[in-house]
Curated annotation (Swiss-Prot):
It comes from the Viruses. Residues 106-133 are annotated as: Disordered. The gene is IE1. It comes from Choristoneura fumiferana nuclear polyhedrosis virus (CfMNPV). This is Trans-activating transcriptional regulatory protein. Keywords: Early protein, Transcription, Transcription regulation. Belongs to the nucleopolyhedrovirus IE-1 protein family.
């Protein structure tokens, strides 16, 4: 065999090794204008030509030289690309702050810090590891997908999914009435696909301003598409009203004028945290924003027709991002479904956790075991009676806010309310420790109230938790014909509306305000301690009213 023949045979079928880097694809793509017939002819011609030993050696040397040159070029390009990528890194807007890992003994300490300079000194970086990773920014709302779930049995409650049409009909629609149109649909150009992808991943907000109008009761004006809503309003719309209710509907923000809401006669919840008129006038360039939710949000949406503005904005922007062809298909299909009324059987679902009770004649008089136990075990118990104590009244704030071992278990609250103040073991509520607490819902509240509203002598209470992780709490205590309510903002319960149903009784409502979730839990316990003093007559309602009127108070009181 001629010299270097083995190398020649290998070079005919394998080129220089491809660098292992993500810039180079493992698959091979051929140009569209590549003529395989010419390649085959050239290969057959080359294989049929007989060469002398010297000519073969010259060809081998030439191929090896070209292979070496190609290898050098590839390595050079790879080195330049790697260096460029190292210097450039990720874009600034996709980076999250550096994560510095400090090694201290055998423990690892992590902390996030911002980049204060382009480079760090050798001493500052000694013993530290910098880990830079891209930040995946969520859109509007974080949603966690569990890695593992288990099937659990829940006897008392289920999550009711309400749909207009049965599930099998909805599945049939998507299988036969919708998918067949998609198979005939031609995809739009790549530009339309990019627009839809950008629309879905967009994190900005469409801002609308709801304000007074000279010619009509109010008007809703589109302001701008921005990333910072409060800055946009403060810079350009502060003259409309420097007190604003913010209604957030996904990526649409409605900035509703406080003055407009008040002039329209809409009831503003007492827990809303906005400055008074005097402060707003003293600082006209300072804007105050109050995010609204739950019942008050529903009221504003309904009164100012914000659902229509949101739907039109979302629908138009979505159709624009999908392109003309697909949008036309959807519009035609939606119009047909509107005409035959099948549009309203789409899977629009609302979920609410309620007891699994059928609406039958036998179940209408149903009482939950929780309420039944409260009524049963509280028949012969009474809150301790005392006379107003000036020493307690003068130290009211100190007593209410001091730390205690109180928990939100029924037995713990019973021990607090029925134990004589200052004598923890002196109580007549041992029987109440048998009560088994249940998760809260609207039906439980109504059952408790209906079972107690006509009883003018009993003393008892109920503690309820809503929302799972959110831990929204509601406590109702009964003393004769009076009910005492302790609550913050609860998503599924409107305390004021519930109170209005039971006009035979006197209702004292303690509403927690101006606090976050953790502080709300703390202040619920504080108000339970306040309730103990009130139920045992150690303080008067006037003392509670005076305490709630303090400037830094975390709750408000009202009698209904």
């Amino acid at each position: 065999m001629p010299k270097n023949m083995a190398a020649l045979q290998q070079s005919l079928y394998t080129g220089p090794s491809t660098p292992s880097h993500t810039q180079f694809s493992r698959s091979t793509e051929f140009p569209e204008n590549l003529n395989f017939d010419v390649l085959n002819d050239s290969y057959e011609t080359f294989s049929s030509v007989s060469l002398t030993t010297a000519e073969q050696d010259n060809q081998i040397d030439k191929i090896l030289q070209e292979s070496a040159a190609m290898n050098r070029d590839v390595n050079s390009e790879l080195a330049q690309f790697t260096a460029s990528e190292y210097v450039t890194g990720f874009r600034a807007d996709t980076m999250e702050p550096e994560v510095i890992v400090e090694t201290i003994g055998d423990s690892m300490k992590r902390k996030a810090s911002e980049l204060d300079s382009d480079s760090d000194s050798g001493e500052s970086s000694k013993g530290k590891k910098r880990v830079i990773k891209p930040k995946m920014r969520q859109r509007y709302k974080k949603a966690t997908i569990q890695n593992k779930t288990s099937l659990t049995e829940e006897c008392n409650y289920n999550t009711e999914i309400c749909t207009v049409a049965p599930t099998d009909q909805i599945a049939e629609y998507f299988k036969h009435d919708f998918s067949v149109y998609l198979e005939k649909q031609k995809s739009d150009c790549q530009m339309s696909a990019n627009r839809f992808s950008d629309y879905i991943s967009e994190t900005g907000y469409y801002v609308f301003v709801v304000k007074k109008s000279e010619h009509k009761p109010f008007e809703v004006v589109f302001a701008k598409f921005v990333n910072n809503v409060t800055n946009e309003y403060t810079n350009n719309y502060y003259m409309v009203d420097n007190r604003v209710f913010v209604v957030s509907l996904n990526n649409v923000k409605f900035m509703v004028s406080y003055k407009l809401v008040r002039e329209q006669g809409i009831d503003i919840p007492p827990h809303v945290n906005l400055c008074d008129d005097a402060q707003a006038e003293r600082n006209p360039y300072d804007c105050y924003f109050e995010p609204v939710k739950n019942v008050f949000q529903t009221t504003l949406i309904n009164h100012f027709h914000l659902d229509m503005y949101y739907s039109q904005t979302t629908f138009v922007t979505l159709m624009q991002s999908m392109g003309e062809s697909k949008s036309g298909m959807l519009l035609n299909k939606l119009y047909q479904m509107f005409q035959d009324r099948s549009l309203f059987t789409l899977p629009i679902m609302l979920s609410r956790k309620e007891p699994t009770i059928e609406n039958t004649p036998l179940s209408r008089n149903y009482t939950s075991s929780y309420v039944a136990q409260i009524i049963k075990y509280s028949k012969n118990v009474r809150f301790p009676e005392n006379n107003p104590d000036n020493g307690v009244i003068s130290r009211l704030e100190e007593i209410v806010t001091q730390k205690s071992s109180l928990t939100y278990k029924y037995s713990s609250v019973a021990n607090l309310l029925f134990s004589r103040y200052g004598h923890q073991r002196d109580n007549n509520a041992d029987s109440l420790k048998k009560v088994k607490k249940e998760d809260g819902n609207r039906l439980l509240v109504e059952q408790y109230m209906s079972q107690n509203e006509n009883d003018e002598t009993s003393h008892n209470f109920i503690v309820l938790q809503f929302g799972g992780v959110n831990d929204e709490r509601l406590t109702i205590a009964k003393k004769g014909i009076e009910f005492f309510w302790i609550a913050a903002e609860i998503k599924d319960i409107n305390v004021d509306d519930l109170v209005k149903k039971y006009t035979r009784n006197v209702h004292h409502v303690f509403r927690i305000i101006n606090v976050n979730r953790r502080e709300s839990t703390t202040w619920h316990n504080n108000l339970l301690k306040l309730l103990q003093l009130l139920l045992q007559n150690l303080i008067r309602i006037d003392d509670v009213q005076q305490y709630s009127n303090k400037g830094d108070s975390k709750f408000i009181y009202k009698r209904l």
